[in-house]
C-alpha cells in the first residue's frame, strides 16, 4: 500500500484506467470509456502520462504536467467514485517491477478512505494479458500512438485484500 490511501477490507471488480487522467484542455480522458461503470471498482493506473517521451505531446512535450502527479491521479479516481487505486510503472520505468516508497504520494493528510496500492509491472502484464488478450505494453503503445484511451473493465478479475495503515499524530513546536 501507499500511505496516502485508507485502511480497510476490500473485494472489488478490476478495471484498467490507462494513465488515470482526465484532461479537458488536452481532450483526453481515461475514464470516459468506463463511464459510470468505474464506480466502486479498483482501477489499475499507469504512472506518468501519455506520450511522455514525445517533445510534441499535448501533455507539455516531454515535461511532466500536473496530470502525471500521483496525488492528482488518486483525486481523479476518487472523483470518478473508484473504490481503490492500484499503480503500476509505465513502460519508461528503468526498473519496471520496482515499487515506490510507502510515503511517495504523501502521508495521507487528505483523509482518503479508499486503498491506494501498487503492484509490479509483471503482475499487471499477466492480468491484462489474461483479461484482454492484449499486453499492457500494447495498450500503452496504442494510447501513445493515437492519444485515445484504452480503458476497459477486466471481466472476471477482482482485487481482494485488507490494508491497515496506522496514523499517529505528533505534537511539535514551531520554532
What residue ranges belong to the model's regions?
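Noncatalytic luminal/extracellular "stalk/propeptide" segments of secretory-pathway proteins
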Residues: 1-56, 154, 164, 169-174
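Acidic, glycine/polar-enriched metal-coordinating patches/loops
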Residues: 66
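Alpha-helical metal-binding/catalytic segments enriched in His/Glu/Asp
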Residues: 70, 175
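Active-site environment of divalent metal-dependent phosphoester hydrolases
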Residues: 52, 93-94
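Active-site-proximal beta-strand/loop segments in catalytic clefts of secreted hydrolases
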Residues: 17-20, 46-49, 87-91, 119-122
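Long, well-ordered, tryptophan-enriched scaffold segments
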Residues: 79-89, 96, 104-173
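Proteins synthesized as precursors that undergo proteolytic processing into mature forms
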Residues: 56-63
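Mature extracellular/periplasmic domains of secretome proteins
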Residues: 4-5, 31-38, 72-83, 100-108
Amino acid at each position: 500500500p501507499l500511505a496516502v490511501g485508507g485502511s480497510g477490507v476490500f473485494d472489488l471488480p478490476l478495471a484498467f484506467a490507462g494513465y488515470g487522467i482526465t484532461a479537458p484542455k488536452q481532450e483526453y480522458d481515461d475514464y470516459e470509456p468506463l463511464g459510470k461503470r468505474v464506480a466502486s471498482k479498483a482501477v489499475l493506473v499507469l504512472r506518468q502520462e501519455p506520450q511522455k517521451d514525445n517533445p510534441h505531446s499535448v501533455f507539455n512535450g516531454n515535461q511532466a504536467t500536473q496530470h502525471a502527479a500521483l496525488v492528482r491521479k488518486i483525486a481523479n479516481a476518487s472523483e470518478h467514485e473508484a473504490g481503490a487505486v492500484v499503480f503500476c510503472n509505465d513502460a519508461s520505468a528503468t526498473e519496471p517491477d520496482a515499487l515506490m516508497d510507502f510515503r511517495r504520494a504523501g502521508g495521507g493528510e487528505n483523509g482518503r478512505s479508499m486503498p491506494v496500492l501498487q503492484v509490479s509491472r509483471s503482475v499487471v502484464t499477466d492480468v491484462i494479458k489474461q483479461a484482454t488478450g492484449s499486453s499492457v505494453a500494447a495498450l500503452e503503445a496504442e494510447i501513445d500512438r493515437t492519444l485515445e484511451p484504452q480503458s476497459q473493465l477486466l471481466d472476471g478479475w477482482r482485487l481482494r485484500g485488507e490494508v491497515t495503515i496506522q496514523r499517529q499524530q505528533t505534537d511539535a513546536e514551531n520554532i
